[in-house]
From Swiss-Prot:
Major subcellular site: cytoplasm
Keywords noted in UniProt: Cytoplasm
Keyword S-adenosyl-L-methionine: no
UniProt record similarity statement: Belongs to the UPF0291 family.
Protein name: UPF0291 protein CPE1003
InterPro entries with a match to the protein in the record: DUF896
Compartments reported by the entry: Cytoplasm
Pfam families in alphabetical order: DUF896
Location of the region described as Disordered in the Swiss-Prot/TrEMBL record: 1-30
Length: 59
């Protein structure tokens, strides 16, 4: 599942939760999807930060 599909499904589950509530399986799915989203976000941020070099290195 790509990040756009992941976000879309999380949003669908959130909307359903607010409107009518979630089943136990849907609640578990939402939590797993949120964890996956956060892990991907962290991974992408780490990779971006690896490529950043400070302008003035102080010793």
């Amino acid at each position: 599942m790509n990040i756009d599909e992941l976000t879309k499904r999380i949003n669908e589950l959130h909307k359903k939760h607010k409107e009518e509530g979630l089943s136990e399986d849907e609640h578990k799915e939402r939590e797993e999807l949120r964890k996956e989203y956060i892990n991907r976000f962290k991974s992408n941020l780490r990779e971006q930060l690896k490529g950043i070099e400070p302008k003035n290195k102080k010793n």
